[in-house]
């Protein structure tokens, strides 16, 4: 496969969900309109918030909407939670240059997550009928994507050392009884910066990217 160029942003500070969403849309619109042919990757952490996908069941929010920041966004999937200690990765990719197949793309993301976890000697797997990655019976990574004219938006999150009790306020991904896990449950004293380095490396390998800064 021919190497692709992608802009990458990796802020150290905790980022507002709204600000990063606007950034994704800017790059998605540029790819769709033909103003740019450069993909965009963002790796970082968000302030505590909840997001719900298209057609989500509002009954999976177990709190009043005025209690927390909730964003209804243009991705598939149900409700999930973002917070410090969770590494979020957004990929704005033109699938014309890879494979115009969303099932292929979702399986590719799962493969990336499993390889990341394996790099830290954490065994993980997928589950038939579900999207995401599990360690045993607990979910450690969630995936939610949007796609317009074969240009993707949103991506995946891996729980590194976040406050898992924040998931108690929702039915995670619409899965009743779903229990969540952190990477730090299996590898103590884990720094999210270490995970960020590996995620970047594996994305680069899997998509044949040449990364540049804007």
Curated annotation (Swiss-Prot):
Coiled coil: none annotated. Pathway: Protein modification; protein lipoylation via endogenous pathway; protein N(6)-(lipoyl)lysine from octanoyl-[acyl-carrier-protein]: step 1/2. Substrate binds at residues 75-82, 142-144, 155-157. One of its GO terms (biological process) is protein modification process. Its EC number is 2.3.1.181. SUPFAM superfamilies: Class II aaRS and biotin synthetases. One of its GO terms (cellular component) is cytoplasm. It catalyses: octanoyl-[ACP] + L-lysyl-[protein] = N(6)-octanoyl-L-lysyl-[protein] + holo-[ACP] + H(+). Keywords: Acyltransferase, Cytoplasm, Transferase. It is found in: Cytoplasm. The keyword Chaperone does not apply. Residues 35-211 form the BPL/LPL catalytic domain. It is an enzyme of class 2 (transferase). One of its GO terms (molecular function) is lipoyl(octanoyl) transferase activity. PANTHER family: LIPOYLTRANSFERASE 2, MITOCHONDRIAL-RELATED, OCTANOYLTRANSFERASE. HAMAP family: LipB. In the reaction, the free carboxyl group of octanoic acid is attached via an amide linkage to the epsilon-amino group of a specific lysine residue of lipoyl domains of lipoate-dependent enzymes. Belongs to the LipB family. Catalyzes the transfer of endogenously produced octanoic acid from octanoyl-acyl-carrier-protein onto the lipoyl domains of lipoate-dependent enzymes. Lipoyl-ACP can also act as a substrate although octanoyl-ACP is likely to be the physiological substrate. This is Octanoyltransferase.
């Amino acid at each position: 496969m021919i190497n692709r160029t992608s802009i990458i942003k990796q802020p150290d500070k905790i980022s507002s969900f709204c600000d990063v969403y606007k950034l994704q849309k800017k790059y998605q619109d540029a790819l769709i309109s033909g103003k740019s042919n450069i993909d965009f990757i963002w790796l970082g952490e968000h302030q505590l918030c909840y997001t719900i996908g298209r057609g989500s069941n509002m009954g999976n929010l177990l709190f009043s909407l005025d209690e927390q920041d909730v964003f209804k966004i243009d991705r598939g999937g149900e409700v999930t939670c973002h917070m410090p200690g969770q590494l979020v990765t957004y990929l704005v990719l033109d699938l014309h240059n890879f494979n115009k197949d969303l099932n292929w793309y979702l399986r590719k993301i799962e493969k990336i997550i499993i390889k990341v976890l394996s790099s830290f000697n954490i065994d993980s797997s997928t589950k038939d009928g579900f999207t995401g990655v599990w360690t045993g019976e607990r979910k450690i990574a969630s995936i939610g994507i949007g796609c317009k004219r074969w240009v993707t938006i949103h991506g995946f999150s891996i729980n590194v050392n976040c406050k898992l009790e924040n998931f108690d306020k929702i039915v995670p991904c619409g899965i009743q009884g779903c229990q969540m896990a952190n990477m730090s449950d299996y590898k103590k004293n884990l720094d999210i910066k270490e995970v960020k380095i590996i995620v970047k490396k594996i994305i680069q390998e899997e998509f044949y990217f040449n990364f540049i800064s804007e």
